[in-house]
Amino acid sequence: MMFRLTSVSCFLLVIVCLNLFQVVLTRRCVPPSRYCTRHRPCCRGTCCSGLCRPMCNLWYGKRATFQE
């Protein structure tokens, strides 16, 4: 009886550990210069236009400048 109880508890412990590892692996952060979303956040910096960057820079083209 004791062997059966021990094996069942070990089996349940393995299932719990596997579930925890799955949560940790799916919630990990994205390194810099990689694709990011709101569900996959950046490790450092912010998600700018789908890429992890240290800070978001706004790039303006020729059409965005005002000329008199």
Swiss-Prot record:
Residues 1-26 form the signal peptide. The modification Tyrosine amide is found at residue 60. Keywords: Amidation, Cleavage on pair of basic residues, Disulfide bond, Secreted, Signal, Toxin. Expressed by the venom duct. It comes from the Eukaryota. One of its GO terms (cellular component) is extracellular region. GO terms for molecular function: toxin activity. Residues 64-68 form a propeptide. Its main location: secreted. The keyword Endoplasmic reticulum does not apply. Disulfide bonds join 29-43, 36-48, 42-52, 47-56. It is found in: Secreted. Belongs to the conotoxin I2 superfamily. The cysteine framework is XI (C-C-CC-CC-C-C). This is conotoxin S11.3.
